[in-house]
């Protein structure tokens, strides 16, 4: 089970610098609010570090082509808007003059304009969603690749940080985080071009407004433009002020939703244990608490939406009326035609909408902010694991090659937690080909942690773990993983099901006592729920015999089996894989009979230490003696059964 080096991670992620010190270790000089704001600001920066690679990666030319095409379509669409605005003036002037010929002529012109505008809108949606789809696919591939590299998905469970529910962040938050920016950028470009175009229209049509107040006369040049700017400034400022807590509330809501889903998932995944223990009431209490948090956050979000709706809804009602009221004096004194009034009203609405883009998009902007930060938090936690594997900060366990006849060696190996707390201290072990080594010790002495360090899943510590370069490692955990799909796929995992024939997999199932499932190898079912704990462990041994590795690591791999079944599995390991090297972690004393050495870990103040390395069977002739012992044990057991 070799682990790819960190250098193989995507180039776009290699250059990520550590976050500022105040993010990793809060500065006493900063208030909690300032520290939190610094963290939020960095998270957005971290998101863009990952996200911008889409335009420079393989396929970046296509991304740029879609982006440039989208901008071109937006510009063309604004041009059509201007043409329709001019048509609006002409049609109302013709109606005012009761010019039927012009009305019919302009009606004929309208249909090509409408068809062109609709076509542009359709192509604009295609380009916009094309960018969103491709960006999401690219960033998802990048995040999932890093999440699945070097066991990061597992290591995240071992370290502190804001990375809970990574599956929800990848599936949902990442979708929002890539969809919204494309909408925002296209919206801003459209708003800017629309504002620039129709401000000219307002300035040209409206001209200056002369006001008399207190005997004094005032002239306001471009009064319609001034009114549009003032109105947009008031509504935007009101929206920013009223919605200033929207981002935090939206982020808390998303987190509460994720925790609620996780609580429900836990019940489904552990249904048997909960049912056997009668823990329904306790689980209901936990679910109710997480759901109460969801309702509380939804209530807060509802309040935010209600406040921002006051501004957005009020603006949408008032905006069309203002230009009519402002143009009414000029229309009534005959200095402005009906067509000019309608053109000005349309232009004012477009300008106000452009200036009020923030008003209309503030809630979604807040939601994007929260989702982007959740993705960035996940990436930042993975960054920390990468730094740990490179040896930045606390020590890193080195991985190398053995010398001489050794298949596996631990050289001055110390294993620590991610904060530097010692778990295992200064382990020195050399294991030769064909040895069966049992790692024993009290619960909590770090046996499983030591095994994870050997397998490469635990990077924190010092010293080195060395393997023979030509030997393959295979690990059997206490809870074997059963993937979705057919039983054939589950038996072959992590290799492809097609790597072995149905007959070969059937033989392996026969060996481990699962022959009754041979006829169901191609059946797709929820096998993780169908198989018992013991059957899953038998299936794991079937995988082992199919893969035929050189080094086997067993981490409580027979804990769900009865003594007879356990003996059978261990006898099969010795029979089917006589030359393999085995390292086992177990509590059952009976397993000593299947091993040639026992390493004992003992808890000490500075971390567990290897206090004894015992030969269970003399090394000279150990395989012959072990084989004889196992035959005698089996014969005696059969006699007792008779």
Which ranges hold each PLM region?
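Primarily ABC-family ATPase nucleotide-binding module
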Residues: 162, 276, 379-438, 461-469, ...
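ABC-family ATPase nucleotide-binding domain "signature/switch" substructure
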Residues: 453, 490, 523-624
């Amino acid at each position: 089970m070799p682990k790819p080096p960190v250098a193989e991670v995507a180039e776009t992620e290699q250059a990520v610098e550590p976050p500022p010190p105040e993010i990793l270790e809060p500065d006493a000089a900063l208030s909690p609010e300032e520290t939190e704001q610094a963290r939020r600001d960095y998270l957005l920066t971290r998101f863009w570090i990952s996200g911008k690679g889409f335009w420079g990666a393989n396929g970046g030319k296509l991304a740029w082509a879609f982006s440039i095409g989208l901008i071109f379509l937006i510009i063309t669409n604004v041009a059509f808007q201007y043409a329709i605005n001019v048509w609006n003036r002409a049609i109302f002037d013709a109606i005012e003059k009761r010019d039927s010929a012009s009305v019919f002529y302009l009606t004929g012109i309208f249909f090509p304009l409408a068809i062109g505008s609709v076509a542009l809108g359709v192509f604009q949606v295609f380009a916009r969603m094309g960018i969103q789809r491709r960006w999401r696919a690219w960033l998802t591939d990048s995040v999932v690749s890093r999440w699945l590299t070097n066991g990061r998905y597992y290591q995240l469970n071992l370290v502190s940080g804001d990375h809970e529910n990574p599956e929800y962040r990848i599936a949902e938050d990442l979708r929002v985080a890539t969809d919204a920016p494309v909408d925002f950028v296209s919206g801003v470009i459209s708003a800017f071009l629309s504002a620039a175009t129709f401000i000219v229209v307002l300035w040209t049509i409206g001209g200056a407004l002369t006001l008399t107040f207190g005997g004094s006369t005032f002239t306001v040049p471009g009064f319609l433009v001034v009114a549009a700017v003032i109105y947009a400034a008031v509504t935007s400022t009101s929206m920013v002020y009223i919605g200033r807590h929207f981002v935090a509330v939206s982020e808390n809501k998303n987190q509460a939703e994720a925790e609620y889903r996780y609580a429900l998932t836990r019940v489904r995944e552990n249904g048997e244990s909960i049912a056997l223990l009668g823990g329904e009431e306790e689980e209901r209490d936990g679910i109710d608490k997480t759901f109460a948090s969801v309702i509380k956050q939804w209530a807060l979000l509802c309040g935010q939406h209600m406040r921002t709706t006051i501004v957005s809804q009020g603006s949408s009602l008032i905006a069309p009326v203002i230009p009519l009221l402002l143009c009414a004096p000029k229309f009534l004194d005959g200095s402005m035609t009906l067509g000019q009034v309608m053109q000005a009203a349309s232009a004012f609405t477009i300008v106000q909408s452009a200036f009020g883009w923030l008003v209309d998009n503030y809630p979604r902007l807040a939601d994007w902010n929260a989702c982007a930060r959740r993705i960035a938090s996940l990436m930042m936690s993975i960054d920390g694991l990468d730094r740990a594997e490179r040896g930045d900060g606390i020590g890193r366990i080195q991985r190398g090659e053995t010398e001489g006849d050794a298949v596996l060696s631990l050289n001055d190996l110390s294993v620590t937690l991610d904060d530097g707390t010692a778990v295992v201290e200064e382990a020195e072990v050399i294991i030769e080909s064909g040895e069966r080594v049992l790692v024993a010790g009290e619960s909590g002495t770090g046996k499983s942690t030591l095994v994870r360090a050997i397998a490469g899943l635990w990077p924190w510590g010092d010293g080195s773990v060395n393997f023979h370069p030509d030997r393959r490692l295979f690990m059997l955990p206490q809870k074997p993983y059963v993937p979705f799909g057919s039983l054939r796929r589950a038996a072959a995992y992590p290799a492809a099901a097609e790597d072995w024939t149905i007959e070969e997999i059937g033989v392996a199932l026969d060996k481990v006592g699962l022959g009754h499932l041979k006829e169901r190898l191609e059946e797709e079912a929820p096998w993780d729920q169908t198989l018992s704990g013991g059957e899953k462990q038998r299936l794991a041994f079937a995988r082992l015999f199919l893969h035929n590795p050189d080094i086997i690591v067993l981490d409580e791999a027979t804990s769900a089996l009865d003594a007879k079944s356990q003996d059978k599995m261990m006898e099969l390991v010795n029979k089917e894989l006589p030359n393999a090297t085995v390292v086992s972690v177990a509590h059952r004393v009976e397993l000593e009979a299947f091993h040639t050495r026992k390493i004992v870990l003992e808890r000490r103040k500075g971390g567990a230490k290897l206090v004894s390395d015992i030969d269970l069977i003399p090394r000279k002739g150990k395989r012959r003696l072990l084989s004889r012992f196992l035959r005698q044990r089996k014969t005696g057991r059969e006699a007792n059964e008779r």
